[in-house]
Each structure stands twice: as C-alpha cells, then as structure tokens.
Amino acid sequence: MSIFTKIINRELPGRFVYEDDDVVAFLTIEPMTQGHTLVVPRAEIDHWQNVDPALFGRVMSVSQLIGKAVCRAFSTQRAGMIIAGLEVPHLHIHVFPTRSLSDFGFANVDRNPSPGSLDEAQAKIRAALAQLA
C-alpha cells in the first residue's frame, strides 16, 4: 500500500482540496511553491503509462481544474504540471502556481513548510475552487 493510499484512506493526515469518486487532490508536504498540490487517482496505479485512458483523462481534467484554482488562489498567470513518477509508486500529478522556470525544481522544495502556510494554501485553493464551480 502506497503512502498516498494511506492518505486517501485517512490512515495518514492530508490537506485535501478536492475529492470525487475516482480522484483526489491534496497539498504536498514538500512544496516547490505555496499551493503545490498533488492530483492522485484513488486506484493505486504505479505509472502513468499503465493507467486506463479514461481514468487518466479524469486525472488530467482534475489537474486542469486544480491548475486554474492555484492560479486564482495565488495570483499567477501560470500553473506548472509535472509527472515525475519516481518518488512514490502511485500515479500523481504535481500542479503548482509558478512565476518562472526556477520554480520547476525538486531540489528547491521547502522541506519544512509551516503548518500555517499549508493551512492557508488549502483554504485559498478551496475558496478558488468554490468560485470556479
């Protein structure tokens, strides 16, 4: 069972911003920028090349929605999206507000974000999603 499955099942804490029957989105605990969100299918699938095309389409659709929300929440014109597939064996899409290419780097993540910063990001993204609905 992956760490993401444990978060989805509420066995570990997660700051969720979106949930439906197939896909969830929650904040990463090591953000590249404030608002860095992971979009994850509930089904534990190791790699994006192995996912059913319909489910992958749903994951991408939710990623697009989260991208719009993080742009609105953090006043950016762009949202970055990365599929790395190396750190956790459970398909996930990194979506984050960005202002420059320098934001695209796992070497620059905040390894110890404050709980308040994560709570603020969660609230902002949820509010932006409500406005987009």
UniProtKB/Swiss-Prot annotation:
Entries under InterPro entries matching the protein: Histidine_triad_CS, Histidine_triad_HIT, HIT-like, HIT-like_sf
Gene Ontology terms for molecular function: hydrolase activity
PROSITE patterns: HIT_1, HIT_2
Domain HIT: 3-106
Motif (Histidine triad motif): 90-94
GO CC term (a single one): cytoplasm
Transmembrane segments: none
Disulphide linkage map: none
PANTHER family in the cross-refs: ADENOSINE 5'-MONOPHOSPHORAMIDASE HNT1, HIT FAMILY PROTEIN 1
Protein name as annotated: Uncharacterized HIT-like protein Rv0759c
Organism of provenance: Mycobacterium tuberculosis (strain ATCC 25618 / H37Rv)
